[in-house]
């Protein structure tokens, strides 16, 4: 197995984001592309990421491969990746090789862990409200909310508008996003309102680097679904369980 990633920096943020929730991950290289799933220890956040085969500059695979890795080790390898770097992933016996080809060539070998089967929850939800937003807009808003000091974020849909609010030590911050003010790219559905953990939501925003747009879907006392759209039809889905009022 050997794959080549031209946008090594963007791809690295998949691992950086995953490590916010889990310590180990099973990487699945299949005929259609790269997949990884995970659930945080508290079972609040379920993650489902797919990067299609066409995303990769090269994708050489004889058989489907499942490779367990320590995300701490992977992030140590890729922490200094630059936008000029090209990344190669290659499996050699019981090692996975990370090669970064940029200003100079560096190769790292990491031990392969036994792959774990992630308990996949049954997700068959009809979300009353959906909206699309630029990931840069969403990320900037969450950065501001983090400074307020609250631990929960309220998502409220009303008359096609989306309101995000956080109550913290500095008071309450409310942001209105709509088609009219340019905060939303698309908006559809009915009124809904629910509360989620701010840290769980904020930790997803590292995906703003490889993703341009984000779909937000939720309902009253339903999980929040955040879909970061990736190139070539890929996606990074985060399902976050609601908090009780």
UniProtKB/Swiss-Prot annotation:
One biological-process term from Gene Ontology? leading strand elongation
Q: Which UniProt keywords apply?
A: DNA replication, DNA-binding
Which Pfam families does this UniProt record tie to the protein?
Answer: PCNA_N
Q: Which cysteines are joined by disulfide bonds?
A: none
MF terms (GO), sorted A to Z: DNA binding; DNA polymerase processivity factor activity
Gene3D superfamilies noted in UniProt: 3.70.10.10
Q: Which family does it belong to?
A: Belongs to the PCNA family.
* Assembly mode: Homotrimer. The subunits circularize to form a toroid; DNA passes through its center. Replication factor C (RFC) is required to load the toroid on the DNA.
Record function comment: Sliding clamp subunit that acts as a moving platform for DNA processing. Responsible for tethering the catalytic subunit of DNA polymerase and other proteins to DNA during high-speed replication.
Query: Which PANTHER family does UniProt cross-reference here?
Result: PROLIFERATING CELL NUCLEAR ANTIGEN (PTHR11352:SF0)
Protein's UniProt name: DNA polymerase sliding clamp 2
Give the source species.
Answer: Sulfolobus acidocaldarius (strain ATCC 33909 / DSM 639 / JCM 8929 / NBRC 15157 / NCIMB 11770)
């Amino acid at each position: 197995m050997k794959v080549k990633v031209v946008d090594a920096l963007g791809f690295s943020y998949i691992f950086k984001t995953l490590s916010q929730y889990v310590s180990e991950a099973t990487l699945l290289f299949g005929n259609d592309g790269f997949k990884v799933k995970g659930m945080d220890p508290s079972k609040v956040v379920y993650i489902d990421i797919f990067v299609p085969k066409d995303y990769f500059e090269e994708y050489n695979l004889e058989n489907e491969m499942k490779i367990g890795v320590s995300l701490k080790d992977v992030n140590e390898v890729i922490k200094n990746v630059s936008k000029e770097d090209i990344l190669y992933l290659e499996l050699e016996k019981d090692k996975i090789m990370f090669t970064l080809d940029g200003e100079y060539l560096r190769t790292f070998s990491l031990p392969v862990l036994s792959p774990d089967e992630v308990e996949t929850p049954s997700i068959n939800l009809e979300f009353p409200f959906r909206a699309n937003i630029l990931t840069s807009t969403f990320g900037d808003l969450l950065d501001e909310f983090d400074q307020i000091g609250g631990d929960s974020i309220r998502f409220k849909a009303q008359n096609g508008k989306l309101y995000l609010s956080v109550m913290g030590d500095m008071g309450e911050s409310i942001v209105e996003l709509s088609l009219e003010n340019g905060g939303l790219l698309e908006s559809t559905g009915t009124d809904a309102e629910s509360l989620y953990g701010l840290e769980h939501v904020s930790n997803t925003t590292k995906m703003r680097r490889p993703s341009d747009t984000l779909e937000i879907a939720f309902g009253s006392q339903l999980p929040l679904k955040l879909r970061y759209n990736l190139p070539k039809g890929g996606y990074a889905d985060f399902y976050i369980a609601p908090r009780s009022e």
